[in-house]
Amino acid sequence: MELKMSASYDATPEEVFAIVTDTAFREQACEKTKALSYDVTVSASGTDTVVRVSRKMEATDIPDMARKFVGETLTVVQTETWHAAAADGSRTADVAGEIANTPVTLKGTARIARDGAQTVQAIDLDVKVAVPLIGKKMEPFVVDAIRSGLQKEHDLGHDWAGK
């Protein structure tokens, strides 16, 4: 199931990139999403910047049909591989993620680019729940949970961009 989101910031692409690759920002985002525990790493790999976030979450608001797959908690692991900036400062990232020990995966791209006087951060994900018969029924719940987390992260990004 496809998930597309974007947020606009009163900042340059370089400033938005600095925010999304800041360990403290990612840790605050984990706290905003009520992670029970988390691990954030930001590292360089050649000209790429790799952001890996692993967060343990309570499995609340999970449909009964999914509860047997996740238990009381779930661990969400997301990796963004941000590529070198283009001449205009824009950047793209490959995004991959999973809910550990479940048949849930996500894959897609993210982009930071100038749009007039603002900068837009956009994400385009394909979320899959690989469970015969019920996977397609579970995907909307997973997408809604991811959308909620991304919205909290975008809201926090606005706070950071305003500093």
For every predicted segment, state its role:
Residues 16-20, 123, 157:
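Hydrophobic pocket/interface hotspot
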Residues 63-66, 134-136:
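Short, charged, solvent-exposed linker or helix-capping segments at domain edges/interfaces
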Residues 1-59, 64-65:
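Hydrophobic ligand-binding cavity/cleft-lining segments
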Residues 69, 87-88:
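Low-complexity, acidic/polar, glycine-enriched regions of mature
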Residues 71, 77-79, 83-84, 135-163:
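A conserved amphipathic terminal alpha-helix motif
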Residues 49-52, 76, 81, 89-143:
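Beta-strand/loop substructures that line and gate deep hydrophobic ligand-binding cavities in soluble
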Residues 65-73:
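Extended Gly/Ser/Thr-rich low-complexity repeat segments
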